[in-house]
């Protein structure tokens, strides 16, 4: 499907994104899959092995056909937009390393993403989750692992990928955790006693020896715990207790921000805690909280009774 030169360039591109651009593992996997899909489509479109000549000759018709195929395959708008970003990134890399120029690819506009408000759980729903997450797990150490991880995410507002990257080295300071977030941006987060105590208990029960620089959250075989595995535990929880369908590890990060805002924290502080580059990203939580207040107002105001 691909000639040798392109295969070698893809490997170099992946190393470039990982080592020089410090892209997250999640982004690397997504970009790699997007490029693979694009090149498979190019192979089908031209009925021939993909060579540098075909890469260079990609025209508006091919690009639009590929985007249409993504839409027909039920890719959501955000995934289509990300796929286009991946292809543009690859072509930009080819400009630098292979002196290959294609202005058509860069002229394609990204589809507009619908602005979905982050969905937060109510405090009651969070408490139900924290109280019962230990019921899911086939051994005691996995049960306490699940609770420790969920409490850590909600107490600190971490992304699931950030929480799963925590090592013993992160735990040396009893008051703060230093996290390396998106774009290699470091932030400092208060280290609450409830999360610290649960993690200490979890490490005491963990049946595997870990080096100080190894991620502490492990799967049942002792390998680093992966987000889909933990989210499967949350699926069991939400189905049994009738919790919202959107409940996921990430919804507890949203809940962290929304509950802080509802309890008087200022936006700038929440922005720093979440590691948002732009304040406008954090402001979406204002809309969520206002919506929550509207619902409470309509339900509880005496004039409606």
Swiss-Prot record:
One of its GO terms (biological process) is cell division. Residues 116-298 form the Tyr recombinase domain. Its main location: cytoplasm. CDD domains: INT_XerDC_C. The active site is at 159, 182, 250, 253, 276, 285 (o-(3'-phospho-dna)-tyrosine intermediate). Disulfide bonds: none annotated. Residues 4-95 form the Core-binding (CB) domain. Keywords: Cell cycle, Cell division, Chromosome partition, Cytoplasm, DNA integration, DNA recombination, DNA-binding. It is found in: Cytoplasm. One of its GO terms (molecular function) is DNA binding. One of its GO terms (cellular component) is cytoplasm. The keyword Cell cycle applies. It holds the Pfam family Phage_integrase. HAMAP family: Recomb_XerC_XerD. Belongs to the 'phage' integrase family. XerC subfamily. Site-specific tyrosine recombinase, which acts by catalyzing the cutting and rejoining of the recombining DNA molecules. The XerC-XerD complex is essential to convert dimers of the bacterial chromosome into monomers to permit their segregation at cell division. It also contributes to the segregational stability of plasmids. Forms a cyclic heterotetrameric complex composed of two molecules of XerC and two molecules of XerD. This is Tyrosine recombinase XerC. It comes from Rickettsia bellii (strain RML369-C). The gene is xerC.
């Amino acid at each position: 499907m691909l000639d040798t030169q392109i295969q070698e360039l893809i490997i170099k591109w992946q190393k470039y994104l990982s080592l020089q651009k410090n892209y997250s593992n999640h982004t690397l996997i997504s970009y790699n899959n997007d490029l693979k899909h694009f090149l498979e489509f190019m192979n089908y479109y031209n009925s021939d092995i993909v060579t540098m000549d075909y890469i260079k000759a990609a025209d508006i018709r091919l690009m639009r056909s590929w985007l249409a195929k993504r839409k027909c395959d039920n890719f959501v708008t955000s995934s289509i937009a990300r796929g286009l970003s991946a292809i543009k990134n690859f072509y930009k890399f080819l400009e630098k390393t292979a002196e290959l120029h294609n202005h058509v690819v860069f002229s394609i506009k990204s589809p507009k993403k619908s602005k979905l408000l982050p969905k937060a759980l109510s405090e009651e729903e969070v408490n139900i989750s924290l109280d019962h997450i230990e019921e899911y797990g086939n051994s005691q150490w996995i049960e306490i692992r699940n609770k420790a991880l969920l409490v850590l995410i909600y107490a600190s507002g971490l992304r699931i990928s950030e929480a799963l990257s925590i090592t013993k080295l992160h735990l040396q300071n009893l008051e703060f955790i230093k996290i390396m977030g998106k774009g290699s941006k470091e932030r400092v987060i208060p280290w609450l006693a409830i999360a610290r105590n649960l993690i200490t208990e979890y490490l005491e029960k963990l049946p595997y020896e870990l080096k100080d620089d190894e991620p502490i959250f492990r799967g049942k075989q002792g390998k680093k715990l992966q987000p889909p595995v933990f989210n499967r535990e949350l699926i069991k929880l939400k189905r049994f207790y009738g919790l919202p369908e959107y409940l996921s590890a990430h919804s507890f990060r949203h809940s962290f921000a929304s509950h802080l805002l509802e309890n008087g924290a200022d936006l700038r502080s929440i922005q720093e805690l979440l590691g948002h580059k732009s304040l406008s990203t954090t402001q979406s939580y204002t809309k969520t909280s206002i919506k929550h207040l509207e619902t409470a107002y309509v339900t509880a105001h005496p004039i409606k009774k």
